[in-house]
Each structure stands twice: as C-alpha cells, then as structure tokens.
Amino acid sequence: MMPVYMDPSQPCQMRPQEYYYQGFGNNSQHMAMDAPPPCHGSCVHGNFPAYWPPCYPPQVPYHQCCMNRSAFHPPHASYAPSCYVHPPFPVGYQPWFDVEKDVPGKHHCGKCSSQMCDLKKDRGVVIEEHEPEIEKGEAVLPVRSTNCPYPIIWIPHENARNQEYRSSLGLGKHNQPPAEVRAPDNMTIQKSFPESWRGCFPFDESSMKSLVQNQDSKKAQNGKTVEAPFDISKFKSLLQGQDMKEAQIQKNKEELGQLTYPTSWVPSRRKRDDVEASESSNEDRKKMQNGKTVEYPFDISMIKSLIQGQDVKEAQNQKNKEEPGQVPYPIFWIPSYGKRKDVEASESKESSNEGRNLESCPSDLHRNEGQITQAKGKEGNFECNVLSDAEEKSSVINIPVANHLQEPRNIPVKLSENHLPKPTEPTKRIAKNEPVKSTKKEQSSSSSEASKLPPVCLRVDPLPKERNGGSKSVSHPKRMEKSKETKIAAPLSSKKAESRTVPEACNVKCEDANAEMKMAEGSLNALRTEKGSVESNSNLQEESNGEIIKPCEAKENREQPAKKSFTEEEAARIIQSMYRGYDVRRWEPIKKLKEIATVREQMGDVKKRIEALEASTDQHIEEKEIVVNGELVMNLLLKLDAVEGLHPSIREFRKALATELSSIQDKLDSLKNSCASAEKEAVKEQVEIKSQPSDSPVNLEHSQLTEENKMVSDTNLEKVLRLSPEEHPMSVLNRTDEKQAESAAETEEGYGLFETLATDSKQATENAAAASSTTIPEKIGEVETVVPGNPPSADGNGMTVTNVEENKAMVVESLEEPINELPQMVEETETNSIRDPENASEVSEAETNSSENENRKGEDDIVLHSEKNVELSELPVGVIDEETQPLSQDPSSSYTREGNMTAMDPKTASQEETEVDHSPNNSKGIGQQTSEPQDEKEQSPETEVIVKEQPLETEVILNEQAPEPEITEPGISKETKKLMEENQRFKETMETLVKAGREQLEVISKLTSRVKSLEKKLSHKKKTQIRRRASKPMSVSPTDAVL
C-alpha cells in the first residue's frame, strides 16, 4: 500500500502526526504522545507511513465517525492487534471553526480542503485557517494548542492531597486552613499511581462525582491557593452533553456585578441596619484565609449544583448564620452596578425627609440628633414622624440647575397654613439585631458629622456655568441669581427669613416681567417675540414658586395687548420699505463715503503743502517737494478710481474730488516751470555778482567805449543793408584766388556747422571754455603786428580815412550778426585756428606793400564783409533772436576784455601808447589795417566763449584797445595778476554751472520716464478692471444653471 505522503490523490503531502495506540497494563508513556487527527468519514487517513508494516488484513469496517453512540468501544480492544484498533472517541472534541454548527456531515478535518470533502458541488471555497477570536469565558478548555486540533486535558490525581506532596512543595504545617475548607477525614494516602491515570476517556460518572465531592477543585494549603488547571464544571457539562455556551452565558448573568478585587462598603445614612444582611449575602464568593483574600478561577458551588442539584448559595448563607464568629473582622461591601441605583434613591429620599423636617423642626434638633436617637434607642423606640412620598413632593420643590449632570437641589419653602400636610401615623423602622452599644457608636459618629456640616438642603452649590441659549433649562440666569441670594440669606435657625425671601423673589420676577411687557410695545416684531417669552416666564414661575405667583400671572394677562392685524396696503408698504433698505445697504454707501472722505482729507493736506512750497525760497527743497506731492496726488487718484459700484448720488462727489486733484496737478506743473525759470535767473544773478568790475579808470573807459560802439553800430547798419547784390560778383573777381577760396570755405562752413551743431549746446560750452585760454594771446599778437605798419599808409592817402570808417561800421555789423549764431558752432573753432597763421602771413605782406595795394585790400575787405553779412542775414531770424535776448543782458564782457589784456606784453602796450598819441588818423589806420584779422576773429574760439554770455561787448574787445596804453608798466603787471585770478574763478563757476545743468536735465528725464511708466500702469489697470467686470455675468451663469 502506498504511503500517504506519496499518494497523489491526497492533497496533504505531509506525514500525519504520531499518535498512541492503546497498549496493555499500567503504561504511562502515552502521556507524551499526541492524539491522532480526527476523521469524519469524508476523509480517510488510514494509510500508514512507509516505515510501518503494511496493513493486512484491510481496515476494520466500523469507525467512530459512523457510530451514533458517543460511548462506543470496540469489543475486546485489549486483545486486538495495535494495527487494527482505532483510537477512542475524543470526549472533549468540539468542531474546529464554530460550536453552534455541530453537524457531523458538514465538517471535515483541519488538514483537508473543502473541495475534496464536497465534490458534488461545482464550486468550492478554500477557507484560510486562522485562530478563532474567542471571547473571555467562552473557551471550551483553559488550555488550547494551536498545532493540535484537540485540547489537552489534565485531571489532578488523588495524590494531590497527600502530605508528602505538600512537603515536596516545601510548605510548613503552621499555616492551617479554616475548618470549613479542610479536607475530609476519610482521605487516605495512596502510594501507587491513581486509577485516573489509567484507561481512556470517558471516565465513569460515579468516579467523577466522588472526585468532585472529595476534592473541591481548589484547596488552600499553608495559606496559599492550589489552583486546578481546568474547570471541572465545564468538563462535567461536556460529559452530560450540555451546551457549554449557554451554561457560560447563564453563569455570566448570574455573576454580574461580581468583583475580582477586595472591596469595602460604607453604608449610607439610615441604612446601617442592613449591614448584617449584606455581609451574609456573600455574592463575591471569596474566602478569607489567614487575613488574606483567596480568589479562585472557577466557582465550586456551580459544580456541586450541577452534580448534586443543591443550592449552594442557600447552604452557604445558612452556614454563615450558624457560624457567625469565624470571621475575625467585618466584611465591607460595595453594592454592584445594578444595586447602586437603589442606594442613590434611598439617599435622595433621606435628603428629602431632612428637607421637610427642617420646616417643622428647629435647627437645634438637627444638631442634637445623635443624643435624641441614643435616648430612643435605650427605650427601644425607633419611631419617627415621616411623611409619605406624595406629601414630600407637595412640600419640597425641586429647582433644576443649568447643569443637568448635577443632582437636583432641594430648597425648602414655607407653605401657607391651608396647604400644610396633616400628620400621619408614625411608621416603624426595622430594628437592628445588633446590641445597643453598636448603635450608640454609629449614631454618635453621625451626630459628629452633622455638627460639622449643615444639612444637605441648605448647602450652597457652586455657580453653574453659563450657556448661550443652548441649554433646555427653564430658569433664567437673572432669576437664578435672585434665588441664590435668597438661599444664602436664609439662616438655619429662623423660619421667618425663609418665608420672606421667596415672595421677594416673586415680586422681583413680576416687576421684570412687567418691564419686559412695557418694552414690548415698541414694535411689532418685539411684540411677537415677547409673547413667547411672557408665556415661558409664566410657566417658569408656576413651576418654581407654585401658588404664590398666581397674582403676578393675573397682572400679566391683563396687560397683554391685542394682536395687531395689517391690511394689504400696510403690509405692502412694510415689505417695500424693508426691500428698499436692503437694496440701499447692498450698495454699501456708508463704507464708500468713508473712503471718499479719507481721500478728501488727504487732498487737504496736499493743498497745504503746496501753499507752503509757494511761500518757500529754497529751490532744492522745492524740487523734492514737488515730486513728492505729485506722487501723493497720483495715489489719491488711484484710490478714487478703486471705489467702484457707487450709487448715482455718490458718483458726483467722486467726480468733484477728481477735478480738484487734477487742478492740483496742474498747479504742481506750473510750479515746476516757475522753478526752472527761477533757477536760470538765479544763475544769471550769481554771474553778474561775481563779474561786477572794481571802480578803476580802465573800467570807466571801457564803459564809455561800449556806448560809443553801440551808437556807431546803429548808424552803420543802414549802409550795409543798402549794398546791392550785383556788387558781390565784381568784388569777388578782383580778389585773388586764395582769398576767394577762403571766403567760399568760410561761408560753406558757416551754413553746415549751423545746421549740424544746433543741438549740441553742452559740448559748445566745454570746448569754448577750453579754447578761450589758449587762443587769446595769438589774436592779440596779430593785432600787435598790424599796428606798426599803419602810420605810413595813413599819412599818404586820404582814401584810407573813409575806408577805415566804413571798415569800422562793417566790423560792428559782422560781429553783431554772427555772434548770435556762434554759440552752437563749436567745431568751427578748429578750422579757424588752422587759418590763423595764414592770416598772419597776409598781414605781413600787407605791411611791405605800397599804399596802392593797401587801398585795394581795403576795398576787397569791404566787399567780403558785405558778402558775409548778406549770407548770415538770410538765416532764420527766430533762431538768432532767441539766443541773443538772454545773452545780451549779461554784463560779463569785462572778463573777456580783461582776459585779452592779460596776454599783452609790455612792449606792445608801449607801442600802442605811441601810436595813439600821434593823431586820430592813426586810429583810423589801425581800424583799416585790422579789418581782415577782425573778420577771422569773429569765428575764432575767443569770440565763441564770449558770445554765450556777453554777445554785444565783443565789439569792445576790438575797439577798446586804444585807451589801454595810458596805464603804466608797473600798473599793468598787478592788474594782469588780478585778471588771471578772476579768469580762473570764472572758469570754475562756469564748470559748476554746467554740471548743475546736467544734473537738472537728468532729474527731469527721470521724472518724465517715471510719469510715463505710471501712466502705462494706470491704463493697464483700467483695462483689466473692464475685463473683470465683463466676465462676472459669465461666471455666474453656469452656477445658476447647475443650481
């Protein structure tokens, strides 16, 4: 026969567990063997392992699963071979998964799957094996093995009571158990192994009964508890075929409230006579041994009740009554969960009785209660006048506190004479079986406690927690305070105070109710709400104060006004007014008006600051304040723009504020312009102050010469204008080729430079300042070279005088017109500086030539000057006039004049003195000879520097050099030093002014860029706001559709 683990038809390919086959004699080796797995008929585990001999003959036909009787045994089991004998039926077996579904046909072994056991069904569910969750007290046996499907059961042998067994444990004999738990006298010592070790289950019931009777399943030896490892009552129930689950449930119900720890019970007041009965009940089933509480895991009385059918509880109570003196000290008992309600009810009744007694009995009786009860106890009378429960309810009123979890407080109230209850017959109380001494002690202890504390009904409870209308308590907080005041004010010994406090509270409540009714007459809504409150208040007063508040109720009922009914028109008006109010509130006009008011206040502050700016004189501070105020105005405009959704009446206010702010902005712009003009004027004033000359004869002569030159220039302008354009080509042909080229180049450069350099004013000032210091000496030198050649030409020719006068007039005109245009022509200075040596060579040639050549040169010069003047006069007049007007006022020509004087040598000065002293013809000759260099000096860098600030006094530089030789040589040296110093100062001031102008330009450019950025932001915000407004109805529509 194939072994089990090699058979492919068997799903479990594991070896079966080893188990013991029934042997012969007193062989106890089976205690170390495991039981075999059970078989229920559907699975056959009859194949033996390979190392055992094959089963011949085949398996015995009968099987324990197929038998109906639980106590079936094979005949002559002891004489049958071990391979043919089946294991006995497991007595303590229960199904693996569920106890209630104990059907033999539906169960299979734990090692087989459900698919093999139930082949008829097409579907099979594989159940995962796991440990069942067994509640406490529902286990079949106390020990459960997870590896083996059956529990391990151990029954204590009879040798457990043996003295030797106790001595082996090392226990002495000095601690003996009490008489009621000692072992029976007929117990004998067995040296051999007990019979319970032999044979298999089931045992005889008689032997089990004797075992249970002789051994109480637990025994206290030498002051310690010996516990049995299993519950015999449960085991007995299995033998008798009872349902252990129902028995366990019944046992739990019976043992409800049984505590597993030592407890103590202090009896309540008026319940001390029941202490003895509670001691005799002994519901917790604890044994007191040598001053220690012994606790057992199972109930011995239940086993006896199952076997003998006796009520162990009654027997134990009778035994305790018969032997009352065995317990050396009293047992204190705490009532179980089910009995606590009765105790609390009794305590509440006692407290109510005390509250009623307070009305009829003085406080001295309560204080001396112990003495009175002792005296009555001696006489044997325990009688007292007690009211019934109905009378207690009528006499004592329970007022609930806001906190429902607390117990109700009992407040005594004195009733009228008509409503006092009639005294009833005294009721007898249960007398105690204890002696009078014990009662005296107990009553004395109660009297001492009563003397320390006041009665329960007059104790003041802590203030209840206030609740915001969530509680269902009927009492109002104000009324609760009034009632508390009455409680505190009431003394313990007087009745009058108690009778007065409650009516006062009633009057206060009535007055409060009347005041509320008067306030309710104001509006319709208040009337409706106050109706409910009045009704609730009346109910409150009825419940709290009983019949005393009836007159207050009558007053309230009289003062209630009739309900007002509205017509349709009145109701429509009310509804419309309410809706209009809601519609106005929806606009939020107050909030937006407040925002506009804040903007208006800030605007007033800005106005004050602007007025202060107008009054101030500091230019630097003004510029900064103007910028700050401009930003403030822009912020206020933004705030006004942010106020949206205005009512039409409010929009007008916003428009007015916006116009005021725009006017303020215009004022700030005008202040900016005025500040700029003021800066220019201040710069001019500073220059004038620094350029004022000292009072000297030289300065006076210069002033006189400037006036004369102005007059000459005015008279000679007409002559130049009368020149016809036909004379120009004739004069050009008579000139030499070199002069024609020079004149043509000069005119072309004049036009081109005027157009290209019209925008570069800054570079012109810098180059002019640099060139002025270098070019002055060269030009003065040129004048010196021209002077010595004049006398011979002047003496011999009469034509030269007229030519010289004409040349002077032409020089004046030529200096007036181009000087106005030269501030923007900086590059022309370089070309003129290159031409200076050519002019010098021409002057030297003029000295060597004869008088005839000189006359020709004079005529040619006049023609050239006329050409230049005509060409320059054709330029736009507006450009020239704009620059000449501010510059003509500058009196700084003295600096240029003095600068020219510094470069002159003392030798040239002496030569000029000699030439000027001869005759006036020399002066005319000087003018005639210097006509050409003067034409070139008009475009030189020296004239450019002077043109920017003093255009009219450049004429003086050329014509004022005649009177200078009057000064002596030592005087010239000192003045030249002063002039040099003043020239340097002038240069420094010019540089500082140029830098300041640049800084101002930068600031202006930054401000303009900032203003542009702010304008862009404003435009962008307005666009986004418009888009958001347009998108609102789109966002609302889908939600409305969904709703």
UniProtKB/Swiss-Prot annotation:
GO cellular component, as recorded: plasmodesma
Renumbered residue ranges of the record's region Disordered: 253-294, 311-331, 343-366, 410-500, 533-566, 724-749, 764-799, 817-975, 1015-1043
Phenotypic effect of disruption: Early flowering and shorter vegetative and reproductive phases, with more branched roots and inflorescences. Early senescence. Hypersensitivity to light. Enhanced susceptibility to B.cinerea and permissive fungal growth.
Biased composition (Basic and acidic residues): 311-324, 343-357, 416-443, 478-487, 550-566, 724-741, 853-871, 934-951
Domain of life where this protein originates: Eukaryota
GO molecular function: calmodulin binding; protein-folding chaperone binding
Induction of synthesis: By heat shock, by salicylic acid (SA), by abscisic acid (ABA), by calcium, by hydrogen peroxide, and by pathogen B.cinerea attack. Up-regulated by HSFA2.
Compositionally biased residues, Basic residues: 1018-1031
InterPro entries: BAG5/6/7/8, BAG_dom_sf, BAG_domain
Disulfide-bonded cysteines: none
Record-annotated IQ domain positions: 568-597
A single BP term in Gene Ontology: positive regulation of autophagy
Coiled-coil annotated spans: 971-1024
Further remarks about this protein from its record: Overexpression of BAG6 results in a lesion mimic phenotype. Processed by APCB1 during lesion mimic development. The cleavage is triggered by pathogen infection or by pathogen-associated molecular patterns (PAMPs).
Primary role: Co-chaperone that regulates diverse cellular pathways, such as programmed cell death and stress responses. Involved in plant basal resistance. Involved in basal heat response through the regulation of the heat induced small HSP (sHSP) transcriptional cascade.
Subunit structure: Binds to the ATPase domain of HSP70/HSC70 chaperones. Interacts with calmodulins CAM1, CAM2, CAM3, CAM4, CAM6 and CAM7. Interacts with BAGP1 and APCB1.
Domain remark text: IQ domain mediates interaction with calmodulin.
Name the record gives this protein: BAG family molecular chaperone regulator 6
Organism classification: Eukaryota, Viridiplantae, Streptophyta, Embryophyta, Tracheophyta
